[in-house]
């Protein structure tokens, strides 16, 4: 399967609710963001991961990669970038997912937003994510890293996941 089951964005049949559901009613929730996500996906990563040698001859790989990249990176806003980002991130998702499963941590990635939930040391998870991203030439956006306990409002892609998945109370009151 070329796109990881841990990737929740840009996939048919996957929505915000499905993404949020696996993080429902956990003791701890950690959210991290990849800094300059699309701009951090290099021409070479697109060439190797989106257009693999066993499916495309070199000339076709080169042409397709050149069509999908701008200034040696995946451009934000291009219609092809979301699907390609999932192909490039598949090995990351599988490695991160396997690491998390061994520790009974739920993991999903929605574009550049990663969510972890369960009972664990948040620092350990953040360090591991950072190390995995570094191997790919990427880094965390530390300003968007958040740790949320059960006593606080835990949100995943705009949905509250404390006891059940629902839109936040403030939004419901506006309706």
Regions found by a protein language model. Name each.
Residues 155:
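Short acidic/His-enriched helical or mixed secondary-structure segments at domain edges of catalytic enzymes
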Residues 160-164:
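Active-site proximal helix-loop segment of RNase H-like, two-metal nucleases, encompassing DDE(D)
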Residues 22-111, 115-151, 159, 169-173:
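Conserved polymerase palm-domain catalytic core
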Residues 1-36:
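Active-site-proximal segment of RNA-dependent polymerases
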């Amino acid at each position: 399967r070329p796109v990881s089951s841990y990737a929740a964005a840009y996939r048919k049949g996957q929505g915000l609710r499905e993404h949020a559901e696996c993080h429902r009613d956990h003791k701890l929730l950690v959210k991290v963001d990849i800094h300059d996500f699309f701009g951090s996906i290099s021409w070479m990563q697109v060439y190797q991961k989106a257009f693999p040698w066993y499916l495309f001859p070199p000339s076709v790989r080169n042409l397709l990669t050149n069509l999908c990249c701008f200034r040696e990176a995946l451009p934000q806003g291009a219609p092809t970038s979301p699907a390609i980002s999932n192909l490039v991130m598949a090995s990351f998702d599988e490695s991160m997912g396997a690491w998390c499963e061994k520790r009974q941590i739920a993991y999903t990635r929605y574009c550049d937003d990663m969510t972890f939930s369960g009972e664990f040391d948040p620092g350990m998870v953040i360090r591991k994510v950072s190390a995995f991203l570094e191997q790919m030439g990427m880094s965390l956006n530390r300003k968007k890293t958040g740790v949320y306990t059960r006593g606080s409002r835990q949100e995943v892609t705009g949905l509250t996941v404390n006891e059940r998945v629902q839109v936040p109370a403030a939004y419901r009151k506006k309706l």
